[in-house]
Amino acid sequence: MAACGRVRRMFRLSAALHLLLLFAAGAEKLPGQGVHSQGQGPGANFVSFVGQAGGGGPAGQQLPQLPQSSQLQQQQQQQQQQQQPQPPQPPFPAGGPPARRGGAGAGGGWKLAEEESCREDVTRVCPKHTWSNNLAVLECLQDVREPENEISSDCNHLLWNYKLNLTTDPKFESVAREVCKSTITEIKECADEPVGKGYMVSCLVDHRGNITEYQCHQYITKMTAIIFSDYRLICGFMDDCKNDINILKCGSIRLGEKDAHSQGEVVSCLEKGLVKEAEEREPKIQVSELCKKAILRVAELSSDDFHLDRHLYFACRDDRERFCENTQAGEGRVYKCLFNHKFEESMSEKCREALTTRQKLIAQDYKVSYSLAKSCKSDLKKYRCNVENLPRSREARLSYLLMCLESAVHRGRQVSSECQGEMLDYRRMLMEDFSLSPEIILSCRGEIEHHCSGLHRKGRTLHCLMKVVRGEKGNLGMNCQQALQTLIQETDPGADYRIDRALNEACESVIQTACKHIRSGDPMILSCLMEHLYTEKMVEDCEHRLLELQYFISRDWKLDPVLYRKCQGDASRLCHTHGWNETSEFMPQGAVFSCLYRHAYRTEEQGRRLSRECRAEVQRILHQRAMDVKLDPALQDKCLIDLGKWCSEKTETGQELECLQDHLDDLVVECRDIVGNLTELESEDIQIEALLMRACEPIIQNFCHDVADNQIDSGDLMECLIQNKHQKDMNEKCAIGVTHFQLVQMKDFRFSYKFKMACKEDVLKLCPNIKKKVDVVICLSTTVRNDTLQEAKEHRVSLKCRRQLRVEELEMTEDIRLEPDLYEACKSDIKNFCSAVQYGNAQIIECLKENKKQLSTRCHQKVFKLQETEMMDPELDYTLMRVCKQMIKRFCPEADSKTMLQCLKQNKNSELMDPKCKQMITKRQITQNTDYRLNPMLRKACKADIPKFCHGILTKAKDDSELEGQVISCLKLRYADQRLSSDCEDQIRIIIQESALDYRLDPQLQLHCSDEISSLCAEEAAAQEQTGQVEECLKVNLLKIKTELCKKEVLNMLKESKADIFVDPVLHTACALDIKHHCAAITPGRGRQMSCLMEALEDKRVRLQPECKKRLNDRIEMWSYAAKVAPADGFSDLAMQVMTSPSKNYILSVISGSICILFLIGLMCGRITKRVTRELKDR
């Protein structure tokens, strides 16, 4: 190829090639050309000249349609005189063209179709109207590829000689100067080239994209096809790649062993060797640098017309007709069309392979794509994406330029729409076929073979690898994971979901239904899809593809274009971030976003907050990440071991995070901190829990819409949900989610945002080193109670903390699981006695109270303590407050929380009282009467009386054991004796009155007389409304009672009723009218009204009501009997019994005799003590 001369600079074709290209500008569209030709020109005007230059064309023909200069005419005359038509020669040495000889036949120029070696092939293959046109015949023959139309070896050799001669005549440059005259003038670089060396034509080819002159551009493009049919005709290519062809075994370099015009296979082989080298970490065979440049330059020069890539042209000719029939050739349009159909089922494998090779070359050098290089030329220059500035290897050139331009777009710079369109196409191309990314091939080869074999189309391999990274199919190496992350950044599918074909196809139906209000290609489409994750509108395949992509987007905040646009200023200011296409080895995955969300929830006092727009985006991302722990890089990284250890069976949506929260105390420190911080964040903005919000949407809309609409949550929404957890509209999923969050809050007081903000200073001061919320609540509550009881001038707990503390206390009463100590103590009892009872609404606690006598000792003690607390502060009695909610509003709207139960008891017998509430009040009264400690008012009023009169009972009682009403019974007896203090007497009177109406309020009576009540008073006990009939029944049947303890209790009742008529409801009802008439002026209490009635009964002038008179007589008879059989309670009772006894004389005689005998013994036996002298006594 020495005839081509020296190449002046790298990547240029020979001057002879460019002479031919420019010369061809004078030719018109050749007859017989296919429907996809480049265009039309002056046609046969140059046919004679081509024949002449080619070594056989006729002489003496002019070029009528070119502007004829005197120089051009002189050149033509010289050629006519010196040259005669000559037949084609056999292959000649590299030193120069074949010898010319005359003999052209009369009357016409030399015709390729008339040559003996090609005549048969031309007649068989080419249409008849092309035979007179050498260029048409040449194009026809070199485009033949079908086996049945194989061209003979002699004809191939003739064609090659013909083309070679066309490329080696130095006189073509002068013709090119005429054809491209105006173009050369416009392109200064080409006008300055020296004349006669072929450099000017080489320059024109370099600037082919800038040629606007139609004639010049069309013919350069047209005639290039001749050269690209054989690598040996491309000047310099043979010299640069000779050794590589041999090493790679790309075919013979000696003519004759292959079809001369089909040597494009050699270029294809070299291209494959080049891309294969990039895909191997330690390639066995390396393409030389000179040949690499030559290969890429040839690919670049063939980038506008697929006819110029001979291998691809022949491999894809049928596919072009099938898929791109209406696509006009030129400017790379056919390439792009074929790329778009690359994964069609009907695409031939050989064409798909050729297209893939072409795409891999584009990945190595963006200029191999004509459309991309042309559309983005000005933008690349504008944003300094120059190749010379590349910090990375040549293999990354396309990806680097894409990222450079994407960075400009993300910074809000203007990039032309044409360039952005091209970028979109090539980003989609990289996502569709993993093999176009050498880094993926290098880093993920093993993973692809092991996990993703057979998934090579439409981006399925990349999504398969993404699935592996998510941990669904195994483990992925760090190098592969990093390569995937880099590819995702290069393709930037977050900016336009259509880039990810697998995602696009899987989610098309969801987008059409759920996201149809968002324009196609908008970045918010992905966000919309995330919002509909795990909803009825989401399909399974879309769900998987979406989460696989989001896994990588979540690890680089820059890959969410909306977040980046709204937060890049804040990130730069607060988190010291780099540019979009810059990375830092010192900044771990997710670090920027972690920084952003830490600042997002800062208060104004803490300073350095995010802008409102950025905060909204951070919240959006947090809401989306809550869907899946794998979307939180830090969480998955730090908690990988714990997830496997504790949560391997938790596979449903959202269960993994809940599992980690449930095992918070068991997690390793780093994981515990991450989960704790996330939970603390959720407490401030529960909307981060997107799944919970979705489940609770009806409740939020009906009851919490006011707080839900607030941009700043601050824990209000969760508080509202807790308050409305038992509404009829509440669904099971929402209730479970809210309860779970409450349970998690118990683990650390920081997890209750409002509580933390209100009480953090108090906790530091009063409860240091306490972490669990329940312990903090107990600590603060105890402090508040002590200050209240001691009537401290100033509370140690601040007012705002006391208010929030009350909210927390009330919330904890709703579910036994919210009181961990009680729950742990009673777990076995719950299983034994309350297994059929559901949690929530304090139902388990109520069940334990009802089975209190059967509980284990530890649980019984805890329940008793709980009841003691509830009685001191009835507002903490969840069941009472729930059942009596409306009655409290009706009867006790102004009542203090401490006196709430007292108020309800006072209104218990009102006609307006709700039966269910009345029943609940009675239950609490029964509880109170079992132990004086459960009645705070009695305890306070009788503080001095209890130790004085009931000391023996207190001494025998064990700590934390119930007294079963013994102390209250003791006080009742003292009440009858009128020995109690006035405050205590008032409280005991109320208890006696209440228990007289309902026997269940007297625990001692119920304990000792249960059998008698069942046998003697079953009908009265079964009555729904207790009005004292059971007590009356027992009094009437006193003589039938055999059990001494029961008889004693009934006698005590009689004794109590004698002390005051109010404690005998039956008598009081019967004598109510008489009391009004005869005893109205008598002050109640201390038996005064009873004495009044007795006097009225004895006074014959007073006529009492018959029922009252009958009841009074019955009572006198009962009291008389009681006086006889009742045991003496003290010395006075004993003396009275002796004096009223029928055997009092006998008793007194025995007592007197005993005294006399004792006296006589003293007289007879003398003194007992030893006698001593007076001196000793006086000393």
From Swiss-Prot:
Modified residues (Phosphoserine): S961
This protein's name: Golgi apparatus protein 1
Tissue-specificity statement: Widely expressed. Highest levels in pancreas, skeletal muscle, placenta, heart, testis and ovary. Also found in the kidney, liver, lung and brain.
Repeat region (Cys-rich GLG1), residues: 116-149, 150-212, 215-278, 286-346, 347-413, 414-473, 475-537, 538-604, 609-668, 670-728, 729-788, 796-856, 858-911, 912-979, 980-1035, 1041-1101
Residues of this chain annotated as glycosylated in UniProt: N165, N210, N581, N677, N786
GO CC terms in record: extracellular exosome; extracellular matrix; Golgi apparatus; Golgi membrane; membrane; microtubule organizing center; plasma membrane
Coiled coil: none
Keywords recorded for this protein, A-Z: Cytoplasm, Cytoskeleton, Glycoprotein, Golgi apparatus, Membrane, Phosphoprotein, Repeat, Sialic acid, Signal, Transmembrane, Transmembrane helix
Signal peptide: 1-29
S-S pairs: none
Predominant location category: Golgi
UniProt cross-references to PANTHER family, sorted A to Z: GOLGI APPARATUS PROTEIN 1 (PTHR11884:SF1), SELECTIN LIGAND RELATED (PTHR11884)
InterPro entries: Cys-rich_GLG1_repeat, Cys-rich_GLG1_repeat_euk, GLG1
UniProt-annotated stretches for the region Disordered: 32-112
Extracellular compartment residues: 30-1145
Spans traversing the lipid bilayer: 1146-1166
